[in-house]
């Protein structure tokens, strides 16, 4: 694992609309920041990237960074340092991002372009085996027969980290709302690791560092298991996690009981945030010290929600940011 820490920059002061966006703490928590691109910035960005369809971003990976450069330039080159600082800051590490004028499923391709630009200002999104691309789009409906909780609407999808069953580093997760019809409930659930009341109890347990087997169901298109502990530490010795209840495979009674207790302790935390994410908005979180999940939906025969995700690793210039003890 490689949780990184940012050197402080003057990005703290970037809250002005003249930068092309606004930036402020969310109503849910000061750890979760809201970033909103102005209608002017959004329109200029879409106009400048119109020449590249989403397929071009799929086929030519360097274009993902180019669209990021365009977005950053429209924001006076103040966006990238702010994103990096926020994602690496242990006290924050989460963003709810909105672009004025993008709020309809008919703009799905524009949503993918915007999310791609933001993600590739902080790093690179990994190959997603479920979709065969660097991003995945999937639909939640009222009835589901899939082999994981990802698309099941009428139950809580428990708190977890992404990237637990792959070997690639998964520093960040991006989750975007593309469409929503006949929908009530289903808020995103977030828990910052430092706000979890039972962290010390489980982090100090002998099983916290034991390598465990993680195996994905067939729909994930991953053919081999991976092994790693549930807990690790960052460069400064602070706890980080790689955990998901559905895919960890305890080898014995001791591991099974400990994992069950851990799951219960996460789900009963009093500090879970419930965050509505309207169509066109997306969450971007540090995957190593934020856990995420989803609340249940209210049943409806025509329920439909479409989501897009990207997950990847941090990469940035060490002239401004570095790891340190």
From Swiss-Prot:
<keyword id="KW-0479">Metal-binding</keyword>
<comment type="similarity">
    <text>Belongs to the glutarate hydroxylase family.</text>
</comment>
<comment type="function">
    <text>Acts as an alpha-ketoglutarate-dependent dioxygenase catalyzing hydroxylation of glutarate (GA) to L-2-hydroxyglutarate (L2HG). Functions in a L-lysine degradation pathway that proceeds via cadaverine, glutarate and L-2-hydroxyglutarate.</text>
</comment>
<feature type="binding site">
    <location>
        <position position="162"/>
    </location>
    <ligand>
        <name>Fe cation</name>
    </ligand>
</feature>
<comment type="pathway">
    <text>Amino-acid degradation.</text>
</comment>
<dbReference type="Pfam" id="PF08943">
    <property type="entry name" value="CsiD"/>
</dbReference>
<dbReference type="InterPro" id="IPR015038">
    <property type="entry name" value="GlaH"/>
</dbReference>
<dbReference type="GO" id="GO:0008198">
    <property type="term" value="F:ferrous iron binding"/>
</dbReference>
<dbReference type="GO" id="GO:0019477">
    <property type="term" value="P:L-lysine catabolic process"/>
</dbReference>
<keyword id="KW-0223">Dioxygenase</keyword>
<comment type="subunit">
    <text>Homotetramer.</text>
</comment>
<keyword id="KW-0408">Iron</keyword>
<dbReference type="GO" id="GO:0106343">
    <property type="term" value="F:glutarate dioxygenase activity"/>
</dbReference>
<keyword id="KW-0560">Oxidoreductase</keyword>
<dbReference type="InterPro" id="IPR042098">
    <property type="entry name" value="TauD-like_sf"/>
</dbReference>
<feature type="binding site">
    <location>
        <position position="292"/>
    </location>
    <ligand>
        <name>Fe cation</name>
    </ligand>
</feature>
<dbReference type="GO" id="GO:0050498">
    <property type="term" value="F:oxidoreductase activity, acting on paired donors, with incorporation or reduction of molecular oxygen, with 2-oxoglutarate as one donor, and the other dehydrogenated"/>
</dbReference>
<feature type="binding site">
    <location>
        <position position="160"/>
    </location>
    <ligand>
        <name>Fe cation</name>
    </ligand>
</feature>
<protein>
    <recommendedName>
        <fullName>Glutarate 2-hydroxylase</fullName>
        <ecNumber>1.14.11.64</ecNumber>
    </recommendedName>
</protein>
């Amino acid at each position: 694992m490689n949780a990184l820490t940012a050197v402080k920059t003057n990005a703290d002061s970037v809250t002005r609309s003249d930068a092309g966006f606004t930036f402020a703490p969310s109503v849910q928590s000061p750890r979760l920041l809201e970033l909103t691109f102005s209608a002017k910035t959004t329109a200029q960005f879409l106009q400048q990237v119109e020449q590249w369809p989403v397929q071009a971003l799929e086929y030519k990976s360097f274009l993902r960074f180019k669209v990021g450069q365009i977005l950053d330039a429209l924001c006076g080159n103040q966006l990238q340092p702010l994103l990096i600082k926020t994602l690496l800051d242990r006290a924050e590490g989460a963003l709810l991002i909105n672009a004025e004028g993008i709020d309809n499923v008919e703009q799905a391709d524009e949503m993918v372009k915007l999310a791609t630009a933001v993600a590739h200002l902080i790093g690179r999104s990994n190959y997603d085996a479920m979709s065969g691309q660097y991003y995945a789009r999937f639909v939640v409906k009222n009835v589901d027969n899939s082999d994981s909780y990802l698309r099941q609407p009428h139950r809580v999808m428990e708190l977890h980290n992404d990237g637990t069953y792959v070997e690639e580093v998964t520093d960040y997760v991006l989750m975007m709302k593309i469409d929503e019809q006949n929908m009530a409930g289903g808020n995103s659930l977030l828990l910052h690791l430092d706000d979890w009341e039972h962290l010390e109890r489980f982090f100090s347990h002998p099983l916290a560092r034991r390598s465990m087997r993680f195996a994905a169901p067939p729909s994930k298109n991953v053919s081999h298991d991976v092994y790693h502990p549930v807990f690790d530490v960052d460069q400064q010795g602070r706890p980080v996690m790689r955990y998901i209840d559905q895919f960890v495979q305890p080898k014995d009674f001791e591991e099974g009981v400990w994992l069950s207790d851990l799951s219960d302790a996460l789900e009963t935390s009093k500090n879970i945030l419930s965050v509505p994410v309207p169509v066109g908005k997306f969450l971007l979180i540090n995957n190593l010290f934020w856990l995420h999940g989803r609340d249940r939906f209210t049943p409806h025969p025509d329920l439909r929600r479409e989501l897009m995700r990207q997950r990847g690793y941090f990469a940035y210039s060490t002239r401004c940011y570095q790891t340190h003890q």
